[in-house]
Amino acid sequence: MEYSDSGITFLLMAGGKGTRFGDQEKCMRDIDGNSILGNLIDSLTPLSHFITVSTTLKHGKTIEFCRSRNIPTIITEGIDYTDDLWHSIVKINKVPIIVMGSDTYITDLGHFRSVIASMNNSEIPIVDILQNNIFSGISLFNRIPGKGEILEYHELNSEKNFSLNINTLEDLNRLKLILSQKTAGHFQ
């Protein structure tokens, strides 16, 4: 059967405290005239019609942005990432779900798509995606976990980078530099 990624659900986690960045709504920071979250949603839209953002009531800009783009939003307590993740997955109640931070910038959509395709029909409950042996912050859930349940997981390594997590201002500045080099024709 030919692979189709249109049935995959993307869950974008946007309820963090933004401690290292100094801004709890870092996903709303501008990158190339669009927010980080807006860029991520624009990148994922060709891959799936099922994109949901999980956030908290403390993230008003994020909630309003999602409302303006008709992106379904799950409101969590924002106290514990694991609880927020579990609550969100249970609320969606559909697998497979690809979970990623709302502060992710996809740098190579074609390669990202091929990584997703390589996991098609995996029977492993969770697949954590690595880039050059470093966790990318992206995981595929093939099963909805029970509350507090620890699921078996597997790591899939991509030897080619396809995304960048924007965790600090330095990461944001590095991405802006990468994008300016790409625009100037110097990107390799």
Regions found by a protein language model. Give the residues of each.
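Hydrophobic packing residues within well-ordered alpha-helices of enzyme cores
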Residues: 21, 62-66, 115, 175
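Generic beta-sheet signal
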Residues: 8-10, 97-98, 127-129
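N-terminal nucleotide-binding beta1-loop-alpha1 segment
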Residues: 1-24
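Conserved core of the sugar-phosphate nucleotidyltransferase
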Residues: 105-188
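Short glycine-enriched, charge-decorated loop/helix-capping segments at active-site entrances
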Residues: 25-30
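Short, Lys/Arg-enriched, disordered terminal segments
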Residues: 1-7, 94, 179-188
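Short acidic donor-binding/metal-coordinating loop in glycosyltransferase active sites
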Residues: 102
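Conserved N-terminal catalytic core of the sugar/cofactor nucleotidyltransferase
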Residues: 2-3, 36-99, 110
